[in-house]
Amino acid sequence: MTINRKPIFRRVLLKLSGEALMGDEGFGIDPKVLDRMAQEIKELVELDVEVGLVIGGGNFLRGGSLAEAGMNRVVGDHMGMLATVMNGLAMRDALHRAFVNCRLMSAIPLHGMCDAYNWAEAISLLKTGRVVIFAAGTGNPFFTTDSAACLRGIEIEADTVIKATKVDGVYSDDPVKNPDATLYRHLSYNEIIEKELKVMDLAAFTLARDHNMPLSVFNMNKSGALKRVIMGEEEGTLISSQASDEVIK
């Protein structure tokens, strides 16, 4: 296997789930997980990779779950947006403590806490090596943070949207329930649909496919996995327009 000495991606959009930040806490944020992710992001910055970041809010609440309990969906989603801002504030602090310059931008105005999202300014910040955290989703209800990640990735012209998960990539079946499930190294957009594989919600996936935005899926709990994805090593699953049947037993 040939290992690239330079990153294969120049600019990336990293999507972290809110649940992943819980770690062993069960609710909220596990400081150890937060600091570890900040260090892994720092490694990318030191490789001159430009990093945009979207974090979910599921470690605090989910608008969809509140709607199922009877709350107005718009209100629930607004609360979910605020949860992503809380995670963004925490990550900004963790990155600053790791001596990484970053900026937090929110899709909804929150003067005094973070900047309002501005596409041109975000591009300028990325070019100067700052990490840009995009909070509050798309700023609209009924859209997931996966959709926000794909949207921001397309807007900032990222080379790939990297989704951090709790498993090693995209499997033929749920690896937790089925130990015989196979791990795919590379899939096309069409193969994802044909095999009915769950990567992200359909709106987000369709947005990425229609704009030919490659998707990378990796295990955020595996130390060094993010860097290996960036370096083009065999890690996780890459989803693009190119078809491949390669699987790892």
Swiss-Prot record:
Pathway: Pyrimidine metabolism; CTP biosynthesis via de novo pathway; UDP from UMP (UMPK route): step 1/1. Allosterically activated by GTP. Inhibited by UTP. CDD domains: AAK_UMPK-PyrH-Ec (cd04254). GO terms for molecular function: ATP binding; UMP kinase activity. Its main location: cytoplasm. It catalyses: UMP + ATP = UDP + ADP. One of its GO terms (cellular component) is cytosol. Belongs to the UMP kinase family. Catalyzes the reversible phosphorylation of UMP to UDP. Homohexamer. This is Uridylate kinase. It comes from Pseudoalteromonas translucida (strain TAC 125).
